[in-house]
Every structure is written in structure tokens, then in C-alpha cells.
Regions:
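Active-site-proximal cap/lid insertion segments
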Residues: 1-181
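Catalytic-site signature of metal-activated, phosphate-bearing donor transferases
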Residues: 183-185
């Protein structure tokens, strides 16, 4: 019982504990379904933090009355979901640190698309389902203190299809020679 994102992270940390205790390498993929509809089930305390926020400055279209109220409510719920993910990522990092494995653990943080509502996408056009940058450009953060200096930025184009070959390359796994995949490191 509990909020889904919390449950996913709890299970991942239990799996990591078992792997570390058994002195085994581990791979954990935590795919939160947040922020995503349905938006009714969000942590109440986090929702309360955002429920009175006016989100109209980040909307790409002016809304009024009921439409603005409904969009503000939805965005408050999305903000609560994002905050919950942030808190869980923080818990995960603290957990890895406490286990003594953070330094040599690769953590990749990414999402799959832009917003599917009238939310701000910077100076980019489009949103989810659009092939414009506002619909397809998304962050990919790579954390590996033992090998990657913090603060580095890259403008290299990549996609989810590139994650597996990049991880295999980073871990010096030669499997791509015998089992080629699409994507590149």
C-alpha cells in the first residue's frame, strides 16, 4: 500500500540491498508512471503545497475561469508527482551512499517526451505527439562519480535506443559484437 512511485523506489532499494549484500553487480530500472494521468492519486501533502499556485505564467495559451481552474489543479497534481520523484531520487542517492556504492554506480535519469498539455516548453515549439523539439527533446542525466566529472554538458543527439549500447560500452561489455543492437554509444 502507498503511492506507486514510493513503492517502486522501495522495491528497487530492496533489490539493490540484496545485490550489494551478495557482492553482485546490479541493474535496476525504475520507470515511474508519474507524472502521468490519472491525476487524482497524488500524495496529499505534496498536492497541498501546490494547490494554490497560479500556474498561468507557464501556460502557452491564456485560459480563463473554469478552464484555468482545472488546468491549475492538474498542474498542481503534476508538480506534486514531480516533487515526489525528486524526493525518491534523493532517497535513492542517500541509500547508495550509505551502502558505499554511489561512487561507482551509474545512475541515468531521463524522460520520454514533452508535456501533453498547454505547459511551457521554453522557446521550443510543440508538445507530446508533436515532432517539434517541445515534444521530443528531453533531458538525459548521467551520474557516475568514479568516471564522469560533474557539470559536463553535451549537445550530442541521442535517444533511448542509445542507452543500452552506452551502458555496455561504459561497463566494458563486448556483447554488441556478437549481438548487435540499434543505437550507438
Amino acid at each position: 500500500k502507498g503511492y506507486c512511485t514510493d513503492i517502486y523506489f522501495d522495491a528497487a532499494m530492496q533489490f539493490i540491498d540484496k545485490s550489494v549484500n551478495a557482492k553482485k553487480n546490479f541493474f535496476t530500472y525504475i520507470a515511474t508512471n508519474a507524472p502521468h494521468g490519472p491525476f487524482h492519486d497524488v500524495p496529499a501533502k505534496l498536492y497541498e503545497k501546490y494547490q494554490d499556485v497560479d500556474f498561468s505564467p507557464i501556460l502557452i495559451k491564456e485560459l480563463k475561469n473554469d478552464r484555468l481552474e482545472k488546468e491549475n489543479d492538474k498542474l498542481a497534481r503534476i508538480a506534486a508527482m514531480i516533487t515526489n520523484i525528486d524526493l525518491n531520487v534523493g532517497r535513492l542517492f542517500e541509500h547508495l551512499q550509505a551502502l558505499g556504492v554511489l561512487e561507482n554506480t551509474i545512475v541515468i535519469y531521463l524522460n520520454d517526451n514533452g508535456p501533453n498539455s498547454l505547459r511551457f516548453v521554453g522557446d521550443m515549439r510543440g508538445m507530446k505527439t508533436h515532432v517539434d523539439d517541445g515534444g521530443i527533446r528531453s533531458p538525459l542525466l548521467f551520474h557516475w562519480p568514479a568516471k564522469v566529472k560533474s557539470g559536463q554538458r553535451s549537445s550530442e543527439m541521442c535517444a533511448h535506443i542509445d542507452v543500452l549500447p552506452t551502458l555496455l560500452d561504459a561497463c566494458s561489455v563486448d556483447g554488441l559484437k556478437t549481438h548487435p543492437v540499434d543505437g550507438r554509444s
